[in-house]
Amino acid sequence: MPTILTIFAWRVAIYPNDHRPAHVHVLGGGCEAVFHLRCPDGPPVLRENYGFSRGDLNKVLLQLEAHLAPMCRAWRALYGDF
């Protein structure tokens, strides 16, 4: 799975052979969360959370918002339209 961004110690990845809508998986420390990107304009929204604290999710969300454009470009490069 391509890592498209690193946020603190967490990897932001798009799984190969994944499905629409455009989304990313955030992994690290035994936790995983999935965020819909809502490309091209956002804002990203949490879809699933497995183990991240609310505070950590807020940190992740701020970084996803700040890096939305390159993540949407990465999704489009792998899968086409959002």
Predicted segment positions?
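Functionally constrained cores in energy, signaling, and assembly domains
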Residues: 2, 10, 42, 63-64, ...
